[in-house]
Regions:
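Interfacial catalytic loop of ABC nucleotide-binding domains
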Residues: 69-72, 116, 132-134
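ABC ATPase NBD coupling module
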Residues: 66-82, 111
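Short coil-to-helix segment of the ABC ATPase nucleotide-binding domain corresponding to the Q-loop/switch region
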Residues: 94-102
Length: 135
């Protein structure tokens, strides 16, 4: 489970990246973060895995306040998240299907569930016909 409550990020100089964001994502849900350039997408994602800290608010992953984690605990928390980045950090030796399935394989999701979810996501974004292609 991922929960952000009243999260804001203001960069030095006063540039507001996010303001009063509230979101609750249940385990197994797929979420797509889309929007125009400068909307705060990258800041939002970077906060989820604690590369950037919010100015205000709280962020919980599976009931753990990630803002209180020590530097040694952060990598373990990150393993609980599956994120595909805007800059296309895809695995070049894996197919589109395998790239989408990768995070679920790491957390040992059953194969049938992975197949169903991956195909649903590929259908949703119109890429099922490219499932066996390489990036």
């Amino acid at each position: 489970m991922l929960k952000m409550t009243d999260v804001s990020k203001v960069y030095p100089g006063g540039s507001v990246a996010l303001q009063n964001v509230d979101i609750h994502i249940e385990p197994g849900e797929f979420v797509f973060v889309v929007g125009p350039s400068g909307a705060g997408k990258s800041t939002f994602i970077k906060m989820l895995f604690r590369e950037v800290l919010p100015t205000t608010g709280s962020i919980f992953v599976n009931g753990v306040d990630i803002l209180s984690l020590t530097p040694n605990e952060i990598p373990y928390m990150r393993r609980q998240l599956g994120i595909i980045f805007q800059d296309y950090r895809l695995l070049p030796d894996r197919t589109v299907y395998e790239n989408v399935a990768f995070a679920m394989e790491v957390i040992e999701t059953p194969r049938r569930k992975i197949k169903r979810r991956v195909l649903n996501v590929l259908d949703l974004v119109g890429l099922r016909h490219r499932a066996n292609a390489y990036p």
